[in-house]
Amino acid sequence: MKFKKMLTLAAIGLSGFGLVACGNQSAASKQSASGTIEVISRENGSGTRGAFTEITGILKKDGDKKIDNTAKTAVIQNSTEGVLSAVQGNANAIGYISLGSLTKSVKALEIDGVKASRDTVLDGEYPLQRPFNIVWSSNLSKLGQDFISFIHSKQGQQVVTDNKFIEAKTETTEYTSQHLSGKLSVVGSTSVSSLMEKLAEAYKKENPEVTIDITSNGSSAGITAVKEKTADIGMVSRELTPEEGKSLTHDAIALDGIAVVVNNDNKASQVSMAELADVFSGKLTTWDKIK
């Protein structure tokens, strides 16, 4: 009888401990859901940042100038991988990346109730979308022109869709190799570079004597490199400004959405465009304010 009583008391003790533990866990979850928002942004010159701030209205025009009102407290990352890592490691973080680079390590929020997907980008329902452009000068080599022809071909656009991006060209023709040789330098957007690596790999299977060097350092850097003739082709993950496009030819190689991402433990599932602008400009600073 005494032994049975001791077991009962032990069970009550464990049960109490469990309730305390659950209570603490619940409190932690609540704290995570209502904590201070950690804004993760891309660097100045990033095409993803340029497109994101323009679409959300964070980028304001003041006469001939454009003012980026991204929160001064934002943690700046210089690559897509940097944003993914920062969001994955912080329960209260929020960032933005290329939809084609989205992995299961983070969670994408719906925007105004619309999920980011190939279909919602194609039909225009998903508001955060942009083209992946390439730029080149009028004196581009025969090899460079052939590589661009491959990108726009049936085989090239198949590489685009195989890598979770959206094809820019619906009417395409078969690419026929001319068995060229030589070297190309492609510079620019970190969002475009992962796709460009796959395109270069597929092109080199058709042209084994070709070397393609790819440098990921931001859209603006890609445009500058082509203008300064230190690169053959530039990668740009946004629309070009009239000034940028003056002396260059550009064309879209793919379409892409911009996914707004949070930690997988975050309870939020959607955000409005208005809330998004307020979050990334520093006006809305806690998760409990997002409805």
Curated annotation (Swiss-Prot):
Induction: By phosphate starvation. Residues 1-21 form the signal peptide. PROSITE patterns: PROKAR_LIPOPROTEIN (PS51257). GO terms for biological process: phosphate ion transport. The keyword RNA-binding does not apply. GO terms for cellular component: plasma membrane. Its main location: membrane. Pfam families: PBP_like_2. Transmembrane segments: none annotated. The keyword NAD does not apply. Part of the ABC transporter complex PstSACB involved in phosphate import. PANTHER family: PERIPLASMIC PHOSPHATE BINDING COMPONENT OF PHOSPHATE ABC TRANSPORTER, PHOSPHATE-BINDING PROTEIN PSTS. The complex is composed of two ATP-binding proteins (PstB), two transmembrane proteins (PstC and PstA) and a solute-binding protein (PstS). This is Phosphate-binding protein PstS 2. It comes from Streptococcus pneumoniae serotype 4 (strain ATCC BAA-334 / TIGR4). The gene is pstS2.
